[in-house]
Curated annotation (Swiss-Prot):
Keywords: DNA-binding, Transcription, Transcription regulation
GO BP: any one term: regulation of DNA-templated transcription
Name of the molecule in the record: HTH-type transcriptional regulator AbgR
Ranges for domain HTH lysR-type: 5-62
Job of this protein: Could be the regulator of the abg operon.
Family: Belongs to the LysR transcriptional regulatory family.
Annotated InterPro entries: HTH-type_LysR_regulators, LysR_subst-bd, TdcA/AbgR_PBP2, Tscrpt_reg_HTH_LysR, WH-like_DNA-bd_sf, WH_DNA-bd_sf
One Pfam family named in its UniProt record: HTH_1
DNA-binding region in chain numbering: 22-41
Keyword Zinc-finger: no
Organism in which the protein naturally occurs: Escherichia coli (strain K12)
Knockout or disruption consequences: Cells lacking this gene may lead to an altered expression of abgT.
GO molecular function: DNA-binding transcription factor activity; transcription cis-regulatory region binding
Keyword field contains Transferase: no
């Protein structure tokens, strides 16, 4: 008879992988360390594969463990979503929604939508992850994020996810007040200055980099920031230049008094998409939240 993986073994395996140790996982699961170790051992024996490297300071996943983790974590998230879906369809409007979004979306679109949704469903917990799409791919794959609203450009993900265009945002070049570049009217006049940008692996910045390369107008980026807030702070308090969403650079709360440089070149707009796994089935409350984001995008674009 073929070995049948049990759900408690999946939970044990995923928690050990996340905590990096039997001790940490046993605390999270409220299990004894011997019972947890036995569960992992039985799982490895049943699969005929070593899932962890055991070391004095903890455990790390083997190649087989990495592969199994992708499936196991998705199984747990799908099970959670299925249970919440049934409860919500029975009128128990509670649970958790996990969403990701780009920094510009979190500072413009998100506050109105989330505050309204929370007033309607105060018992629902919403977890928000901010960043570029590249930083969220694994969470989307594993079901740890229900959806994200982010930029996307010619990536290898078309077969995994659906992409629904929601809105576009204009980008511009910014500097601090009093910067010697003020008065420049073209990107070529700015190429000798120091630049900082969010990670070039991000979808929009990859598109922008390719466009400027074609036009021989690529600035030398000396500092790469993983967050927009770090990028904005560096521009505000130094001589670095950067390309940012117009609304973020012009907002006194987030832009810290930045100055937009009126260059003659028009930067391409960034398209933002609702991105979901192709095989995902959203719970009623998650579908309702998505609808509210769609409506807010329509309002902002009108």
């Amino acid at each position: 008879m073929a070995f049948q993986v049990k759900i408690h073994q999946i939970r044990a395996f995923v928690e050990v992988a996340r905590q990096g140790s039997i001790r940490g996982a046993s605390r999270m699961l409220n299990m004894s360390q011997p019972a947890l170790s036995k569960s992992i051992q039985e799982l490895e024996e049943g699969l005929a594969a070593q899932l962890f490297f055991r070391r004095s300071k903890g455990v790390t996943l083997t190649d087989a463990g990495e592969s199994f983790y992708q499936h196991a974590s998705l199984i747990l998230e799908e099970l959670r979503a299925a249970q919440e879906d049934i409860r919500q369809r029975q009128g128990q409007l509670a649970g958790q929604i996990n969403i990701g979004m780009g920094a510009s979306i979190s500072r413009s679109l998100m506050p109105a939508v989330i505050s309204r949704f929370h007033q309607q469903h105060p018992q629902v917990k919403v977890r928000i992850m901010e960043g570029q799409l590249v930083s969220m791919i694994n969470e989307l794959r594993q079901g740890e994020l229900d959806f994200t609203i982010n930029t996307y450009y010619q990536g290898p993900y078309d077969h995994e996810f659906t992409f629904e265009k929601l809105l576009e945002k204009q980008f511009a070049i910014f500097c601090r007040p009093g910067h010697p570049a003020i008065g420049a009217r073209s990107i070529k006049q700015l190429l000798d200055y120091s630049w900082t940008m969010p990670t070039p692996h991000g979808s929009y910045y990859k598109q922008l980099s390719e466009l400027l390369d074609d036009q021989a107008q690529t600035p030398q980026v000396g500092v790469v920031c993983e967050t927009f807030s770090a990028c904005i702070s560096l521009v505000a308090k130094s001589d670095f230049l950067s390309k940012l969403p117009e609304e973020m650079g012009c907002d006194p709360l987030h832009g810290q008094g930045l100055v937009m440089l009126p260059v003659s070149e028009i930067l391409p707009k960034a398209a933002y998409y609702l991105i979901q796994r192709r095989d995902s089935r959203q719970t009623p409350l998650t579908a309702s939240l998505i609808t509210q984001f769609r409506r807010e995008c329509g309002y902002l674009q009108s």
